[in-house]
UniProtKB/Swiss-Prot annotation:
Record InterPro entries: Marvel (IPR008253), Synaptophysin/porin (IPR001285)
Keywords from the UniProt entry: Cytoplasmic vesicle, Glycoprotein, Membrane, Transmembrane, Transmembrane helix
High-level lineage: Eukaryota, Metazoa, Chordata, Craniata, Vertebrata
The protein's name: Synaptophysin-like protein 1
Places the protein is found: Cytoplasmic vesicle membrane; Melanosome
Segments on the Vesicular side according to the record's topology features: 55-116, 172-212
GO CC aspect terms: extracellular exosome; melanosome; membrane; plasma membrane; secretory granule; synaptic vesicle membrane
Gene coding for it: SYPL1
Entry similarity comment: Belongs to the synaptophysin/synaptobrevin family.
Ion transport as UniProt keyword: no
Residues carrying sugar: 71, 212
Length: 259
């Protein structure tokens, strides 16, 4: 038992010595591994910002002749996390339009699961990129001398690539459904608009260009992480032995790694 405690203390002591040796080295940022990580960090910001910060509204024009001959605007406001079934229609303040309580009617659909999965994952990626860059730049020797850290980085990179594909695909499908649910189909779904005495016309809906951009950045992130997997793999023990065994046996100097 005592030898085991001694070994644990010794490992903790070595780790503490390495962690205390923080020294900024910007050279890793000039290599593909570090440079692509910076691009991943920036792309993740655009991914969650363009989706999570969206606010929009859809409008319909209503009249019911002969009581109301002038079109009145009824508006439903929606945004992230896109629980459309909680977005009720609102008439102008103090205006009774066709004796209908428009607040009782809402948009159709709940797309919060896809939207929140996408944004939450993008935020986690953002935080991981910060931690990875801190390790690359501040603890370069610790990363290069360790067998576990590059392997963990490699596994995380593969998982992140897959999750970018899954989350972006799910969000792209949800976005398509959101466009349908807030578009011209509103007229066909609203019960008051099915009455003969009430005439409804689709007005407008907020442009969803930023949401389209979020999907683009999602797939861009997937490409960046997938491409960076090779450079992370080169730092692992899975790749290094084949490159370092020959030079060592000949008494030469092993080739430099990606960092």
């Amino acid at each position: 038992m005592a030898p085991n405690i001694y070994l644990v203390r010794q490992r903790i002591s070595r780790l503490g010595q390495r962690m205390s040796g923080f020294q900024i080295n910007l050279n890793p940022l000039k290599e593909p591994l570090g440079f692509i990580k910076v691009l991943e960090w920036i792309a993740s910001i655009f991914a969650f910002a363009t989706c999570g910060g969206f606010k929009g509204q859809t409008e319909i024009q209503v009249n019911c002749p002969p009581a109301v001959t002038e079109n009145k605007t009824v508006t439903a406001t929606f945004g992230y996390p896109f629980r459309l079934n909680e977005a009720s229609f609102q008439p102008p303040p103090g205006v009774n339009i066709c004796d209908v309580n428009w607040k009782d009617y809402v948009l159709i659909g709940d797309y919060s699961s896809s939207a929140q999965f996408y944004v939450t994952f993008a935020v986690f990626v953002f935080l991981y990129c910060i931690a990875a860059l801190l390790l690359y730049v501040g603890y370069t020797s610790l990363y290069l001398d360790s067998r576990k850290l590059p392997m963990i980085d490699f596994v995380v990179t593969l998982v992140a690539t897959f999750l970018w594909l899954v989350s972006t695909s799910a969000w792209a499908k949800a976005l398509t459904d959101i466009k349908i649910a807030t578009g011209h189909n509103i007229i066909d779904e609203l019960p008051p608009c099915k009455k003969k005495a009430v005439l409804c016309y689709f007005g407008s809906v907020t442009s969803m260009g930023s949401l389209n951009v979020s999907v683009i950045f999602g797939f861009l992130n997937m490409i960046l992480w997938g491409g960076n997997a090779w450079f992370v793999y080169k730092e692992t023990s899975l790749h290094s032995p084949s490159n370092t065994s020959a030079p060592h046996s000949q008494g030469g100097i092993p080739p430099p790694t990606g960092i």
